[in-house]
Curated annotation (Swiss-Prot):
InterPro entries: Aldolase_TIM, PRAI_dom, RibuloseP-bd_barrel, TrpF_fam. Belongs to the TrpF family. One of its GO terms (molecular function) is phosphoribosylanthranilate isomerase activity. GO terms for biological process: L-tryptophan biosynthetic process. This is N-(5'-phosphoribosyl)anthranilate isomerase. Its EC number is 5.3.1.24. It comes from Syntrophomonas wolfei subsp. wolfei (strain DSM 2245B / Goettingen). CDD domains: PRAI.
Length: 204
């Protein structure tokens, strides 16, 4: 069954809304972004959440020492590397790693296997932007990889297209951020519930 990660969580209220709707994990962004979360705030949120939901930290080209400090301070369960990190970098991380790739054409599975992460995340490509664009991409590039590896699908997912994405790829996880937000920003609990309900319906 495909799981749901709600990314760009910025408050305890948003985290609880995701947990109560049935999300598998929340994503907390520690990289330059409108959804960036300060370390002390993330640590406070995660103390309240305890082990009730997985907490995944999103990083872009972060120094390994600083990443390890944030993982410990915020009690992160996993990290998502969303930048240009090389395969050797993964060996410096003490928790499971999700490695992100921005898709702009065909993908070579053997090249991707150099990283050996816990899972591969695929997002849409936009020059100079590391995720969170709200844009989707051609999922057909991922069909072979999805049959062989754990994949997480991101990039422009919403209540209108997530059912089709799951039917086409059967990813381990779907990752959503802007697709469950209010027009003014911030997570919309009703959209989170609707999104997760659609994902769960695909398993029946």
């Amino acid at each position: 069954m495909t799981r749901v990660k709600i990314c760009g969580i910025r408050s305890l209220e948003e985290a609880i809304a995701a947990r109560e709707a049935g999300a598998w994990a929340i994503g907390q962004v520690f990289a330059p972004s409108p959804r960036r979360l300060e370390v002390d705030i993330a640590a406070a949120i995660n103390r309240e959440l305890g082990q009730s939901i997985l907490k995944i930290g999103v990083f872009v080209n972060e120094e390994a020492e600083n990443l390890r400090r944030i993982v410990a301070s915020c009690r992160l369960d996993m990290v998502q590397l969303h930048g240009d990190e090389e395969p050797a970098y993964l060996e410096e991380v003490s928790v499971p790693v999700i490695k992100s790739f921005r898709v702009r054409g065909s993908l070579e599975l053997e090249q991707l296997k150099r990283w050996r992460p816990w899972a591969y995340l695929f997002d849409s490509y936009h020059p100079g932007v590391y995720g969170g664009t709200g844009e989707s991409f051609d999922w057909s590039f991922l069909q072979e990889i999805a049959r062989q590896e754990r994949i997480i699908l991101a990039g422009g997912l919403n209540t209108e297209n997530v059912g089709r994405a799951i039917h086409q790829l059967r990813p381990l996880v779907v990752d959503v951020s802007s697709g469950v937000e209010y027009p003014s920003g911030g997570k919309d609990p009703a959209k989170i519930r609707e999104f997760i309900n659609i994902v769960q319906e695909q398993a029946t």
